[in-house]
Amino acid sequence: MRMFILLLLLAANPLWANGSISIAVAANFKPTLEKVTEPFLANTGIFVTYSAASTGVLATQILHGAQYDLFFAADEDTPQKVAAAKALPASDAFCYARGSLVLAGSEDGLSALAQPGQSLAIANPATAPYGRAAMEVLARPEFSAGQGRKLVKGNSVAQALQFWQSGAVDMALLPRALQAAGAVEVPLDWYQPVAQYAVVLNHSAAVDEYLQWLRSDTVRSLITDAGYEPCP
């Protein structure tokens, strides 16, 4: 009887018959990952689900037992720490993209960061690598005059973007890949490079097929088109 029910479920959900993958992904990369995955879904029928949040929040969930097959973080250290905590091979952590910062909402370029009257949104630096990069930029001496500004910290870069888009703040320091209209690029030497790493938490035939897809030239082009730099 149980086998009959299972066969009915597989018939009703043909994607499940080809396997499934559960992915935890840093909020900045979710839109790109969805675009990257669309051709994979069409070609394989493997079902992919996403859970997006800041890197720190996702790592905490994983270390407390949340079940995912892959974890796409927005930094290098967190996936390596997760791999070590779960006794996973170091080779299961890999670089998939390099990100950069932009300032959205400024009419005066980057000099607006020195204006205390301009409110600013960033991702929470305690849990989001792009938030930490933003704090490095704000700590520069030329922006010390702006230290009295209203600084709003979102739970993730996605929420920081929402704060700016809704008009709750004047400006936002965001990943370039979020493609905020009219944003100004922040020089790369103003903050530590944002190398984004992933880690394989659970190997399966579906996961291994997905990893092979991620290494393809097609995916590298999609990631570059989305506003990231490819890994070496």
List each language-model region with its residue ranges.
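Exported/periplasmic ABC-transporter solute-binding proteins
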Residues: N18-N43, F47-A52, G56, T60-H64, ...
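Short acidic/histidine-rich motifs immediately flanking catalytic phosphotransfer sites
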Residues: A66-Y68
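N-terminal signal peptide c-region/cleavage motif recognized by signal peptidases
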Residues: A12-P14
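Sec-dependent signal peptide recognition
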Residues: M1-L7
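Hydrophobic/aromatic side chains embedded in well-ordered alpha-helices
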Residues: L7-L8, L63
